[in-house]
């Protein structure tokens, strides 16, 4: 995990914008600016943002501009970056800070959302956990398993919620596949195949502030392996009900050395379970943007083609394509979900955003890196 908060590295797109009939006057610097909070807020929590270098921040700032969320503070050390976003989203001076700790002390947010380099997620938790402030970061949870373990320790010690956001968590098609599989309509799951990625972060126009760290092995933890491999690891953990794999084998390719000299741009990860096999294909070399999910059982097959469309085939019956039923709050967006979890109205312990599941994700990614480095199957 990771706000829509869209995870992956797609071109920033502002989603679910609302055009009101009239714009009421701003009543407070940090309040949403053009929709009545009583009818439009996705969350009543006082949210804060740590970092602006992740392009997915456009989604939460779009929600702020449209009056759907309350942002009380934004911490970003880069003044040029702060100024750019301030101008684009008409952000008041009163919510902008150059330091996370100063912002927390001044604004006392309920939750901090991380839009900084993955390797810096740990800094947010170090600052927030002792103060009892919950955190949600963009996927993956951390750059390394060691960082994730430290973050887990802090979250458990100080009783905060530490969540990871993935774009695919809010896909109706994926939830439909999960629901059908959970009813044993496909029989025993035997194979899970996940494709994630696009033509490459630079190729699709991600900002330089984003790609500077996304293509750095220290700041991102890897290249395409971390960026898109985490999706498959997360979905497999969810579909396998939190079961840890028994072994991981991976290979990495470097097709675009001139464009991405420091990191791999393609990875294939094979995840072994006692009764099933998972195949993760993560790449910055697809001919188009892709996020899909295939599940094969003893008695049936389902393929979530994209966010909405699902193909189902049971035994030898003809395949049927349908549009998945739209999700409803809090399962349709990360902000509403976040509020219910942090206020203990939704457990959030065994789902795709949970700390428990994302520690397993980090174990899979760590094993994949070791497999690549050592050229062998890694037994967990």
Feature annotation, model-predicted:
Residues 1-13:
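Bacterial N-terminal signal peptides
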Residues 18-41, 111-113, 341-380:
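C-terminal helix-rich "cap/oligomerization" subdomain common to oxidoreductases
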Residues 20-89:
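N-terminal Rossmann-like dinucleotide-binding module
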Residues 28-31, 232-309, 336-349, 367:
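Contiguous beta-strand/loop segments that form the cofactor/metal-binding neighborhood of enzyme cores
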Residues 49, 137, 162-164, 304:
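Hydrophobic residues in well-ordered beta-strands that form the structural core
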Residues 89-154:
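Beta-loop-alpha module in the N-terminal Rossmann-like domain of NAD(P)-dependent dehydrogenases
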Residues 150-168, 190:
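Rossmann-fold dehydrogenase core element
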Residues 169-259, 375:
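Predominantly a Rossmann-like dinucleotide-binding segment in NAD(P)-dependent oxidoreductases
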């Amino acid at each position: 995990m990771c706000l829509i908060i869209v995870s992956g590295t797609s071109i920033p797109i502002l989603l679910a914008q609302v055009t009101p009939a009239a714009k009421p006057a701003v009543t407070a610097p940090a309040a949403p600016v053009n929709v009545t909070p009583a009818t439009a807020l996705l969350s009543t929590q006082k949210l804060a943002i740590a970092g602006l270098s992740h392009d997915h921040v456009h989604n939460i700032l779009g929600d702020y501009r449209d009056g759907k969320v309350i942002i009380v503070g934004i911490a970003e050390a880069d003044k040029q970056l702060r100024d750019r976003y301030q101008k684009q989203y008409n952000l008041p001076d009163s919510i902008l800070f150059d330091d996370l700790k100063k912002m927390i002390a001044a604004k006392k947010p309920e939750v901090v959302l991380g839009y900084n380099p993955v390797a810096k997620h740990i800094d947010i938790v170090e600052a927030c956990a002792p103060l009892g402030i919950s955190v949600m970061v963009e996927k993956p949870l951390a750059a390394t398993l060691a960082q994730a373990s430290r973050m887990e320790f802090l979250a458990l010690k100080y009783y905060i919620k530490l969540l990871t956001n993935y774009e695919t968590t809010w896909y109706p098609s994926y939830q439909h596949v999960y629901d059908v599989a959970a009813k044993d309509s496909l029989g025993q799951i035997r194979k899970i195949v996940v494709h994630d990625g696009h033509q490459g972060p630079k190729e699709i126009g991600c900002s330089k502030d984003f790609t500077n760290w996304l293509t750095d092995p220290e700041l991102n933890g890897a290249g395409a392996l971390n960026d898109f491999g985490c999706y498959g690891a997360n979905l497999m953990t969810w579909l396998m009900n939190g079961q840890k794999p028994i072994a991981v084998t991976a290979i990495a390719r470097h097709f675009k050395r001139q464009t991405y000299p420091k990191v791999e741009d393609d990875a294939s990860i094979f995840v072994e379970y006692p009764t099933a096999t998972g195949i993760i294909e993560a790449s910055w070399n697809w001919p188009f943007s892709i996020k899909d999910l295939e599940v094969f059982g003893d008695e049936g097959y389902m393929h979530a083609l994209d966010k909405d469309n699902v193909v189902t085939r049971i035994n030898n019956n003809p395949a049927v394509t349908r549009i998945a039923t739209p999700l409803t709050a809090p399962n349709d967006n990360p902000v509403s979900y976040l509020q219910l979890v942090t206020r203990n109205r939704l457990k959030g312990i065994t789902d795709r955003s949970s700390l428990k599941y994302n520690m397993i994700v980090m174990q899979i990614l760590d094993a994949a890196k070791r497999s690549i480095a050592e050229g062998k199957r890694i037994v967990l």
